[in-house]
From Swiss-Prot:
The gene is hisC1. InterPro entries: Aminotrans_II_pyridoxalP_BS (IPR001917), Aminotransferase_I/II_large (IPR004839), HisP_aminotrans (IPR005861), HistidinolP_aminotransfase (IPR050106), PyrdxlP-dep_Trfase (IPR015424), PyrdxlP-dep_Trfase_major (IPR015421), PyrdxlP-dep_Trfase_small (IPR015422). Keywords: Amino-acid biosynthesis, Aminotransferase, Histidine biosynthesis, Pyridoxal phosphate, Transferase. Its EC number is 2.6.1.9. The lineage of its organism: Bacteria, Pseudomonadati, Pseudomonadota, Betaproteobacteria, Burkholderiales. This is Histidinol-phosphate aminotransferase 1. Belongs to the class-II pyridoxal-phosphate-dependent aminotransferase family. Histidinol-phosphate aminotransferase subfamily. It catalyses: L-histidinol phosphate + 2-oxoglutarate = 3-(imidazol-4-yl)-2-oxopropyl phosphate + L-glutamate.
Length: 356
């Protein structure tokens, strides 16, 4: 601790990202990256943008990118906010929309960046327990007395992978008209229903998505939010008080091309979903309890094997999976859906571990 720190810094518990080791022949199933790579058209667009214009600042409004996103998801361009990854978008959300002096509500088992943002911005929060079978119950988000300072949850939830139907999300939004409800749809393209079509109907709904997962652009850091013009204007005001140029020229070019290449997007996400179902069946055949997943990962536990030890033994075999040392889920592993060959290697390694 430094005597030069601001007082809040010493109270922070920063987010811990998944490890990114530089090891040869590693099967990396721990950070939910897409195994199929970006659209070739996105790579071509990035290469084409890597020219003399890099000496110039990018468009601070990211108009072309916002237009491409709007066209892809069916909203107007002025209903789109873009940021340097959905984590930055979420950071702006907490600053712009959640600092009301009232607790923000989110699930007890959810994206671990939410309490980090609350600590950073000194926002009170209240965790809402998932059900015994790890579902978000819309009834638990009915207002009781004073309106919440905000509501946020992933759909599908992370790390569980379970998803709410669109009408269930709308129940939460409708029940909280005086509260901004943020739906974090990082994994929505792998089998869940997006609530983006509802933003015209509900001015308190904000939808956040990313190009890191289904568009295979985690290395570019591009995320976006969809919502009413008033919510988007609030995010823009915070962004322009922090960094007016969050999206660089290369990221913008690649993201636009990725959003426009619908055929590649559909083909690769369908491949991920098909592999997920095969891997889930294979894990169940080995005795794992596997939660239903609408994401590009599965959440599984084995009744006879400790999760932390399994993760360690898989690592010895150059296979990385994610283990969380958190109450209620410390016996689960979150396993990213890789290629068929990677998932077959995982199953083979588990069979050897169980037989040894």
């Amino acid at each position: 601790m430094s005597r030069y720190w601001s007082p809040v810094v010493g109270t922070l518990s920063p987010y811990v990202p998944g490890e990114q080791p530089k090891l040869p022949d590693l099967i990396k199933l721990n950070t939910n990256e897409n195994p199929y790579g970006p659209s070739p058209k996105a790579l071509q667009a990035i290469a084409a943008a890597a020219g003399d214009t890099l000496r110039l600042y990018p468009d601070p409004a990211s108009d072309d990118l916002r237009g491409a996103i709007a066209a892809a998801v069916g909203v107007q361009a002025d209903q789109v906010f873009v940021g340097n990854g959905s984590d930055e978008v979420l950071a702006h959300v907490f600053m712009a929309l959640f600092r009301h002096g009232r607790p923000v509500r989110f699930p007890d088992i959810s994206y671990s960046f939410y309490p980090v943002y609350c600590g950073l911005y000194e926002i009170p929060y209240q965790v809402v327990p998932l059900t015994d079978d790890f579902r978000i119950d819309p009834a638990d988000y009915q207002p009781g007395g004073q309106a919440a300072g905000g509501i946020i949850f992933p759909n599908p939830n992370a790390p569980t992978g379970r998803a709410l139907a669109r009408d269930e999300v709308e129940r939460i939004v409708t029940a909280n008209p005086d509260t901004v409800v943020v739906v974090d749809e990082a994994y929505v393209d792998f089998g869940a229903e997006s609530v983006a079509p509802l933003v015209d109907r509900h001015d308190n709904l904000l939808v956040v998505q990313t190009l890191s997962k289904s568009r295979s652009l985690a290395g570019l850091r591009v995320g976006f939010a969809l919502g009413s013009r008033a919510l988007i204007d609030g995010l823009e005001r915070v962004k322009n008080s922090f960094n007016s140029y969050p999206i660089d020229r290369l990221a913008s070019a690649g993201a636009q091309a990725a959003m426009q290449d619908q055929a590649y997007f559909d083909r690769t996400r369908q491949a991920v979903m098909a592999t997920r179902e095969r891997m889930s069946a294979d894990l169940r055949a080995l005795g794992f309890d596997v939660l239903p997943s609408a994401a590009n990962f599965v959440f599984a536990r084995h009744p006879e094997h400790d999760a932390a030890q399994l993760a360690a033994r898989l690592r010895e075999r150059s296979i990385l999976v994610r283990h969380f040392r958190q109450a209620r889920i410390d016996q689960f592993l979150r396993i990213t859906v890789g290629t068929d060959a990677q998932c077959e290697a995982l199953i083979g390694a588990l069979k050897k571990i169980f037989s040894s």
